[in-house]
Amino acid sequence: MIGRLRGIIIEKQPPLVLIEVGGVGYEVHMPMTCFYELPEAGQEAIVFTHFVVREDAQLLYGFNNKQERTLFKELIKTNGVGPKLALAILSGMSAQQFVNAVEREEVGALVKLPGIGKKTAERLIVEMKDRFKGLHGDLFTPAADLVLTSPASPATDDAEQEAVAALVALGYKPQEASRMVSKIARPDVSSETLIREALRAAL
């Protein structure tokens, strides 16, 4: 269906971005590790997408490159892992960090992600390790790791509320999300920075 979008960013409301292509606005759900890399509103962006059809919704998930999208597709094939949980996984750690955690069988790192218990972490390691072999080890290389840069957008008065809302959307409970943000909140910081630091602190 829709595999790639090239258009102007109209609005950024993590983890959602609205991209206008040919007069049509597409709402795209993105992992926060990809969201951080987006240009500012009003600028052009290219996003690789995966289209998910449910009984109650049709959703687009977006990524900065094909490798991240491939990993997302492999994740949602795992028993007990749907698109929302896969999005949370790739928001809590970069694609390369996840690949490294699986290859090193780091259950402790995976269970810190929202919605991941010990059994799910162990299942991910077993199933994803086999899939990585099937991809001939070419899914990612160390050089492909994401470099998270500080967003240039100015902080807003409701940055903390936006950060909490984004964490809830990623699977954290409201009280837990509020606590995570309050620990690292400070004046004049954008919501994207708060989200990134909250996720880092959680790991």
From Swiss-Prot:
It holds the Pfam family RuvA_C. This is Holliday junction branch migration complex subunit RuvA. GO terms for cellular component: cytoplasm; Holliday junction helicase complex; Holliday junction resolvase complex. Residues 65-142 are annotated as: Domain II. The RuvA-RuvB-RuvC complex processes Holliday junction (HJ) DNA during genetic recombination and DNA repair, while the RuvA-RuvB complex plays an important role in the rescue of blocked DNA replication forks via replication fork reversal (RFR). RuvA specifically binds to HJ cruciform DNA, conferring on it an open structure. The RuvB hexamer acts as an ATP-dependent pump, pulling dsDNA into and through the RuvAB complex. HJ branch migration allows RuvC to scan DNA until it finds its consensus sequence, where it cleaves and resolves the cruciform DNA. Keywords: Cytoplasm, DNA damage, DNA recombination, DNA repair, DNA-binding. It comes from Shigella dysenteriae serotype 1 (strain Sd197). It is found in: Cytoplasm. Residues 143-154 are annotated as: Flexible linker. The keyword DNA-binding applies. Belongs to the RuvA family. One of its GO terms (molecular function) is ATP binding. Residues 155-203 are annotated as: Domain III. Residues 1-64 are annotated as: Domain I. CDD domains: UBA_RuvA_C. Homotetramer. Forms an RuvA(8)-RuvB(12)-Holliday junction (HJ) complex. HJ DNA is sandwiched between 2 RuvA tetramers; dsDNA enters through RuvA and exits via RuvB. An RuvB hexamer assembles on each DNA strand where it exits the tetramer. Each RuvB hexamer is contacted by two RuvA subunits (via domain III) on 2 adjacent RuvB subunits; this complex drives branch migration. In the full resolvosome a probable DNA-RuvA(4)-RuvB(12)-RuvC(2) complex forms which resolves the HJ. One of its GO terms (biological process) is DNA recombination. Its main location: cytoplasm. It comes from the Bacteria. Gene3D superfamilies: 5' to 3' exonuclease, C-terminal subdomain (1.10.150.20), DNA helicase RuvA subunit, C-terminal domain (1.10.8.10), Nucleic acid-binding proteins (2.40.50.140). Has three domains with a flexible linker between the domains II and III and assumes an 'L' shape. Domain III is highly mobile and contacts RuvB.
